[in-house]
A protein has these predicted regions:
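TRAFAC-class small GTPase G-domain
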Residues: 1-188
Length: 188
């Protein structure tokens, strides 16, 4: 039996140390035992494909985990050029991470096709959001929700360390639901 796949290009973007690679490993590789003791910054993009079934339709996910450092922004444009779905990551305990996600979103929006689906992912939700003592670094939940609403983003929380599969699956299901709705409208 031959299966026809609908191919979806999914790109993971966000600032350095925002958890893209661990999310990638959980989503694509289904790693249960992740090592969090030693952070190593990614210095190149990673690619894997994953076959899934959603609402009885086969999909092939082409998943790109991009590099988060600002010096690679000019290269990142290539990845979201033909993306169907873009996940934008920030971490809760850093206002700078959220500002970086905003900047990256603007770059992705300019350089992507008009029907791309964007999802903002607040990562490391298990960590204390108020762990930084300086007031300037603490994120305001209202600011995040305002950004989500203003830009019509799908929003979700992710915790790779604690119950990671629930957060990742919930975000992914929201995005796939939106993706299939958009595809139905195009095909009618």
């Amino acid at each position: 039996m031959e299966y026809l796949y609908n191919t979806i290009k999914l790109v993971l973007i966000g600032g350095e140390n925002s958890g893209k690679t661990k999310f990638f490993e959980c989503l694509v590789k289904k790693k249960q035992d992740l090592d969090f003791s030693n952070y190593i910054s990614s210095n190149s993009a990673q690619y894997l494909c994953k076959d899934i079934i959603y609402k009885n339709i086969f999909y092939r996910l082409d998943v790109w985990d991009t590099v988060g450092q600002e010096k690679y922004d000019h290269i990142a444009k290539i990845f979201y050029k033909d993306a169907d779905i873009v996940f934008i990551f920030f971490i809760y305990n850093s206002k700078n991470s959220f500002k970086r996600a905003n900047t990256i979103f603007q770059l992705a929006q300019i350089n992507s096709k008009p029907d791309v689906i964007f999802a903002l992912i607040g990562n490391k939700y298990d960590e204390d959001k108020n762990c930084l003592k300086e007031e300037d670094n603490i994120l305001n939940e209202e600011e995040i929700l305002e950004f989500v609403e203003k830009n019509n983003l799908i929003f979700g929380h992710s915790s790779i360390k604690e119950n990671y599969s629930d957060g990742i699956n919930e975000i992914f299901m929201k995005v796939m639901n939106e993706y299939t709705k958009k595809k139905k409208k195009i095909n009618i």
